[in-house]
A protein has these predicted regions:
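Cytosolic linker/terminal segments flanking nucleotidyl-cyclase catalytic modules
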Residues: 1-30, 37
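Predominantly a core beta-strand signature of beta-propeller blades
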Residues: 28-29, 69-72, 125-128, 163-167, ...
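Terminal hydrophobic membrane-targeting helix
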Residues: 30-31, 39-43, 49-65, 69-75
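Conserved beta-propeller blade repeats
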Residues: 36-52, 78-108, 129-150, 155, ...
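Structural motif
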Residues: 57-62, 112-118, 153-156, 196-202, ...
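Short loop/turn segments that connect beta-strands within beta-propeller blades
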Residues: 65-69, 121-125, 159-163, 205-209, ...
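Residue-level "micro-hotspots" composed of small/polar
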Residues: 259, 263, 536-541, 562, ...
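Ankyrin-repeat and related helical/solenoid repeat scaffolds used for protein-protein interactions
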Residues: 502-538
Length: 577
């Protein structure tokens, strides 16, 4: 690897050399890595950066010289699988450094979030399990005496050995990215509200008292996430997203707030440290409070389809960065969601005659063509609001809400004649789930009997069947409109994602992301054993607002979204008052 390269452009930190800053600023920004690997978690000291990287089949931890002069994968850590065998940890996440910087706190990333935490020597050797605790995310205190970790909606505190575990705080959503202040007195963490599509920064004292949200009425507080203290404890650096004025682009920026007040609240708004066009996140502060390290991201999502004759994935529309692409019934038009930006577009099947249909601060997702090709239904994801379905003319116009009823709405399904629209809920509470059908003639919405507790509805093309999922995403239910009866169709070994009916309404296909190799599976009406029809293999899939997406092209081939984003480590010089 070569040396670091300066990143050109204006940042809020630009100033006259030698002038004392009145507020935190970023000076030089330099690119440290140039390897092209996807990156997630990052921890750093002043000489080394440890970053979780995605190769073709695994998540590994790379150690990178802070000046970009060298890069090496850390050894595979041995850990006891049983009393008589040894194994190697895979899919690693770098979560933190020990006080003496000789050990890494790591976990194995799993979709369930029930990860074990391990202390592993940087120089190689046997890893040590930290008690029997499990969770999503964890962090050591600066003195190494305690471990804080999040599991579901609960923040826990334990000693360094993972013992003496006790509940510290119970939040209203899932908790992650906990970080001790350098003096160990308080812990800041992120709470995610999945239904509202928001995140929020919180603080709690080490003894569990004085829990409160940060940032007051700041406009971007609903996207704030994942912070890191400067080593001197004077500032807390975090990430939050904002729309670029007069564009469809959303940029994740780094911000700073002072920690001078004991209650963690500040009269002034956070100070903007980066302004784009690149997004920055996963920030880690150096020991001297003079440098930050972060992952810089330039998102690019390529919709591809599987070409069986060539046994490879090929672009659907070359040069287009998008997700959630759907063809009109006649195959002549497409609708899709732009990446970045999350806006709804319509275009010819070859990408020409492109027309932007939505604007504003919200994201669009899951567009669905009406049978006559005149209208597109889509879901609007606005932070702090329930997800709602809208209809918009394919030629452009003003979006119209599908229903004024409260609660979330998602997964629009048109009836074959276009006179009705079926949709479901997005809600983690099974008691609040149901499936409804809107009649455009009467403007009445009715709940499908027996659909309580079900979501992700899929109407068969002939109108006879409805497939829907139980909250565990593995139990697939089937409703027969002719017999007006529900029955359990299958219980999958992995999660059922993005189900799609066959054109003849006799089979349902779904994306299996968990059961071994990612694959497309098919189950026929009247049968209960899914069969594998396509292995996705090592395709690097883009993670969008609703996870990884799949669908079917006009020719029946399978479509996926390949992640072609650039993710590299950057060093940002920090200038403090």
């Amino acid at each position: 690897m070569g040396g670091i390269a300066a990143v050109a452009g204006f940042y809020p930190g630009s100033r006259v050399r030698g002038a004392a800053p009145e507020s935190p600023r970023i000076g030089a920004i330099t690119q440290v890595t140039h390897d092209g690997f996807g990156k997630t978690d990052l921890v750093a000291d002043d000489s080394q950066v440890y970053v979780s990287e995605l190769d073709a089949t695994n998540r590994v931890i790379a150690r990178v010289d802070a000046q970009g002069a060298s890069r090496a994968l850390l050894p595979e850590y041995s850990f006891p699988k049983s009393s008589d065998e040894q194994g190697s940890m895979t899919n690693l996440r770098a979560l933190g450094l020990s006080a003496d910087h000789t050990k890494l706190l790591v976990s194995s990333k799993q979709t369930s979030g029930e990860n074990e935490f391990w202390s592993v020597p940087i120089a190689g050797g046997a890893a040590k399990r930290i008690g029997d605790v499990t969770g999503r995310d964890a962090s050591w205190s600066a003195d190494g005496a305690q471990l804080v970790f999040g599991k579901g909606a609960v923040l826990y505190l334990a000693n360094a050995a993972g013992l003496k575990v006790h509940e510290l705080y119970r939040a209203s959503g899932s908790v992650f990215a906990p970080r001790f202040s350098p003096d160990g007195h308080v812990i800041r963490f992120t709470v995610r509200d999945a239904e509202q599509n928001t995140t929020a920064l919180w603080e709690v004292s080490r003894d569990g008292s004085k829990a409160h949200a940060l940032l007051g009425n700041w406009a971007a507080k609903s996207t704030a996430c994942c912070g890191s203290w400067t080593a001197d404890g004077r500032y807390y650096i975090f990430q939050a997203s904002q729309s670029v004025p007069n564009t469809t682009t959303v940029v994740t920026k780094l911000w700073a707030i002072s920690s001078s007040r004991e209650d963690g609240l500040n009269d002034s708004e956070p100070v903007e440290l980066t302004s784009g066009p690149m997004s920055f996140g996963n920030v880690s502060a150096g020991r001297d409070s003079k440098n930050l390290w972060a992952i810089g991201v330039q998102p690019w999502a390529e919709v591809v389809k599987y070409d069986a004759s060539r046994n490879e994935f090929v672009p659907v529309v070359p040069g287009l960065s998008a997700s959630d692409l759907e063809f009109s019934a006649d195959g002549k038009w497409i609708t899709y969601i732009s990446i970045p930006g999350g806006k709804l577009f319509r275009a010819r099947a070859d990408g020409s005659e492109k027309l932007q249909l939505t604007s504003g601060s919200g994201l669009a997702a899951l567009p669905r063509w009406s049978p006559d090709g005149k209208t597109i239904a889509y879901v609007s994801l606005k932070p702090g609001e329930s997800w709602k379905l809208f209809l918009i003319p394919a030629k452009g116009g003003v979006p119209q809400a599908v229903s004024a009823e409260s609660g979330s709405q998602i997964d629009a399904n048109w009836s074959a004649d276009g006179k009705r629209l079926m949709f479901g809920d997005f809600n983690h509470d099974a008691a609040g789930l149901s499936i409804r059908i809107l009649d455009f003639k009467t403007h009445k919405t009715t709940m499908l009997p027996g659909s309580e507790g079900l979501f992700s509805p899929r109407w068969s093309p002939d109108g006879r069947y409805l497939a829907a999922l139980a909250p565990d995403s593995t139990s697939l239910m089937l409703y027969d409109f002719t017999e007006q009866k529900w029955s359990k169709w299958i219980t999958a070994s992995g999660a059922v994602n993005y189900p799609v009916w066959s054109a003849d309404s006799q089979s349902l296909y779904f994306d299996d992301l968990i059961d071994g190799v990612e694959s497309i599976r098919r189950v026929k009406v009247g049968q209960s054993e899914p069969e594998k029809v396509l292995e996705v293999g090592n395709l690097d899939r883009y993670m969008g607002a609703l996870g990884v997406w799949s669908g079917r092209a006009a020719d029946g081939s399978w479509m996926f979204v390949r992640d072609k984003s650039t993710q590299e480590v950057y060093q940002l010089s920090l200038e403090l008052p």
